[in-house]
UniProtKB/Swiss-Prot annotation:
Cystine residue pairs: none
Phosphothreonine sites (modified residues): 175
Induction details: By stress conditions e.g. heat shock.
Family: Belongs to the heat shock protein 70 family.
Keywords: ATP-binding, Chaperone, Nucleotide-binding, Phosphoprotein, Stress response
Domain of life, source organism: Bacteria
InterPro entries referenced in this protein's UniProt entry, alphabetically: ATPase_NBD (IPR043129), Chaperone_DnaK (IPR012725), Heat_shock_70_CS (IPR018181), HSP70_C_sf (IPR029048), HSP70_peptide-bd_sf (IPR029047), Hsp_70_fam (IPR013126)
Name of this chain's protein: Chaperone protein DnaK
Acidic residues: compositionally biased ranges: 585-601
Annotated spans, Disordered: 570-601
Compositionally biased spans, kind Basic and acidic residues: 575-584
Amino acid sequence: MAKEKIIGIDLGTTNSVVAILEDKTPRVLENPNGKRTTPSVVSFKNDDIIVGEVAKRQLETNINTIASIKRKMGTSETVKINDKEYKPEEISAMILSYLKDYAEKKIGSKIKKAVITVPAYFNNAQREATKTAGRIAGLSVERIINEPTAAALAFGLDKTDKEQKILVYDLGGGTFDVSVLELANGTFEVLSTSGDNFLGGDDWDNEIVKWLIGKIKLEHKYDVSKDKMAMARLKEEAEKAKINLSTTSTTSINLPFLAVTDSGPINVEVELKRSDFEKMTQHLVERTRKPVRDALKEAKLKSEDLHEVLLVGGSTRIPAVQEMLQHELNKKPNHSINPDEVVAIGAAIQGAVLSGDINDVLLLDVTPLTLGIETQGGIATPLIQRNTTIPTTKSQIFSTAADNQSEVTINVVQGERQMAADNKSLGQFNLGGIEKAPRGTPQIEVSFSIDVNGIIKVSATDKKTNKIQTITIENSTSLTEEEIKKMIDDAEKNKEADAKKKEKIDVTVRAETLINQLEKTIKDQGDKIDPKEKEQTEKEITNIKDLILQDKIDELKIKLDQIEEVAKAFAQKAASKETSKNEQNEDGSIDAEIKEEDPKA
């Protein structure tokens, strides 16, 4: 009987990737668009849920589109769509379900199990939320592993006979982690981990966005930050500019008709130099330096002890990031693996280990933060120190703080601060029925255990009566079992109907994007367009709208193929006439263009 496959999923802030091991060789699975990475974006349109490339294209036009939901995992925040509130786990489940569906089509069999990666610095609530998202998507999450650990697995799969110490620098879309691992005799042991859950490639994009907002305000006296659609376009162009500046010294940012004011349309055309980009983001690069030093210190290593420095996450392509790291560690980072795919590949390898397809690899991960309980005076008393190898169990005896105390409250905290209030409370429970006695007399054993997924269980036992109270620390904001079951059932019920809707959604989105472009051109440039062309275009818009209303998808596809190229030429012609007019003065003369170099540009 064939072993059941376990896929590996990198559920990223910006993009997600799914991989599998076939014949002991990792394979990244392409999505329906032929891409190996899928945007972690979900869009709601009427009753339809759209994920990935098509959803990302709607960021500009559809306010019911959600990106970077990973930043909210493990929190009580919700997103409101059409009068319904969704928890982060639900949105993430939609992404996971999409990945699962196309993976099944690629390998030709059902998938029930997955290994999902999380940032090393994800706390317990965030890990539980990730497991919950997997369950809603119909996946049994066999293991949650840290992203840097997964990267090291991918790098070291064919090097298990060599003893090496590896530093993994993982700069994702929304999180940043550094881990130090030791590889020896097929064992991958995490020695330390450090990072920042609120730093990622998005922050580099945002610096460009802020720069553009300032330029537009200065030149056009318009605050574009209050225009949602314009901001979506700015963010998309900022990301493109960041990517371009990794390989070129200068990039152009062109945003025609970004907005329309009383003075006319705002057209943005600026150049951004890599040197200026590096100045505006230098503070972000510097924020990554301390976690690198902390991880080495925790591992009791120096930079010269490292054999390899691995780069993970698309933003590690930024030259300033690589230069800082090389200068800090006096070692050139390893570029041999694709930073966008390596985490999913590592997760797939761990899946193969769990399924028995790989037998000579052992992964020993660590807990990223100290765990303890609140004791008298609000002190955080640690039981399991950060960077302890998991799974692990630790017990300690405590007592009462007052005479004749019959009940104690156990407040479980996570963090490195001395006072419990300064750390994150993961949950609390009461142990009652304690026999009356002077303070300090009763013996209460508190035990912590952390499993391989980093999920925590805590128990308190009265040693005299053997009365015990146990809690599994779960995300205090997570969904109830009933809610999770309902969502799983709903997802299964709607699966066939959703599949039938997919083609309709893709074609309709294409059509509506085209309509928006044409209507905007007519609205902004109508007086400059030939009346016959304008009339013909308006008729075509009406025809397309009618086909959408009548659900005539096949006819709509044919119509779109015919008109898209015509529409492009139509928009270019209108823009050309506007440019010609703007270059003329009122007396009919045309000024020569004079460029003045802006030292801040």
